[in-house]
């Protein structure tokens, strides 16, 4: 039997449902497990963690929106991840991890051989967490390093922390998707990120929606896109104080670069973005940016789900 998906959202889990989930994990019949916003007792959470520890078919685990709600649950998840070898995408968006909680998880994350996509958006992280995350980016032996990283809505991270992340992305990472939306970055941090993008050989998607940018940083990003060949294909700048004209210019340049790649036969296969990642703001919908001068043209910038697309590549 081919592995299937279990997706439950915002519901209290009964004992019978937990037993079915654990049975599916133990039988290696589950490829995707999503329990976003579900309510369950500590005992049942522990049962699921013990089952996923030995699961060999599980590739995506979504525990967004407060499922990992206490230090004891963080420890149980860390213990499961130390044993598990199959999970490629881990979503913990909206979990009250804090720096201390990520420190508990980090050893398991750092040693996991398959993990390529990590969502730590809205997890109450600060600079100490950034220090740990930077260590997850570069390849290490058989590990490929993270290819998708989401850090949306973590306002406790300071410019010092963001500068450290920018250096890590530029220097040794394999990151293809970087979601930093709804953080108070400002123009100074955006300038450092522009340098990181110009240096990176892999970064394709950068989400800076609602990050306090102005025309100053937009001009820097425009210069970067115009003058330096990069892998960047999608740049999200919505909900910033940036003129429509500058947004249009950046949009046009990114579109031109993609067209040139396609004409040369070097464009990568279209990735299937948007599955698994939570909106950074509770009221927020899809992250898309329409080029201002053409209401019919749209550059779709849903910037998640890389783990799924990588799974598809593996299965082909």
From Swiss-Prot:
Signal peptide: none annotated. Residues 272-281 have a biased composition (Basic and acidic residues). LRR repeats lie at residues 57-78, 86-106, 114-137, 145-166, 174-187, 202-223, 231-250. Keywords: Leucine-rich repeat, Repeat. Residues 257-296 are annotated as: Disordered. SUPFAM superfamilies: RNI-like (SSF52047). InterPro entries: LRR-containing_regulator, LRR_dom_sf. This is Leucine-rich repeat-containing protein 73. It comes from the Eukaryota.
């Amino acid at each position: 039997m081919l592995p299937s998906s279990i997706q439950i959202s915002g519901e209290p889990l009964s004992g019978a449902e937990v037993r079915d989930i654990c049975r599916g994990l133990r039988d290696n019949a589950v490829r995707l497990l999503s329990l976003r916003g579900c309510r369950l007792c500590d005992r049942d959470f522990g049962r699921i963690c013990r089952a996923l520890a030995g699961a060999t078919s599980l590739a995506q685990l979504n525990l967004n929106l407060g499922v990992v709600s206490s230090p004891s649950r963080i420890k149980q998840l860390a213990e499961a991840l130390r044993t598990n070898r199959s999970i490629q995408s881990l979503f913990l968006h909206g979990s009250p991890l804090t720096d201390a909680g990520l420190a508990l998880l980090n050893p398991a994350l750092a040693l996991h051989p398959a993990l390529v996509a990590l969502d730590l958006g809205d997890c109450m992280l600060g600079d100490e967490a950034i220090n740990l995350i930077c260590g997850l980016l570069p390849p290490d032996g058989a590990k490929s390093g993270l290819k998708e990283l989401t850090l949306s809505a973590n306002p406790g991270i300071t410019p010092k922390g963001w500068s450290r992340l920018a250096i890590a992305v530029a220097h040794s990472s394999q990151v293809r998707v970087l979601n930093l939306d709804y953080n108070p970055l400002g123009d100074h941090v955006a300038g450092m990120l522009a340098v990181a993008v110009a240096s990176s050989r892999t970064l394709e998607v950068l989400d800076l929606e609602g990050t306090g940018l102005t025309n100053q940083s937009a001009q820097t990003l425009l210069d970067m896109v115009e003058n330096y060949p990069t892998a960047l294909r999608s740049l999200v700048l919505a909900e910033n104080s940036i003129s429509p004209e500058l947004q249009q210019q950046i949009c046009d340049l990114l579109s031109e670069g993609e067209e040139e790649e396609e004409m040369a036969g070097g464009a990568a296969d279209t990735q299937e973005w948007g599955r698994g990642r939570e909106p950074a703001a509770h009221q927020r919908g899809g992250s898309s940016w329409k080029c201002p001068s053409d209401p019919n043209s749209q550059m779709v910038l849903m910037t998640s789900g890389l783990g799924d697309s990588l799974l598809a590549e593996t299965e082909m």
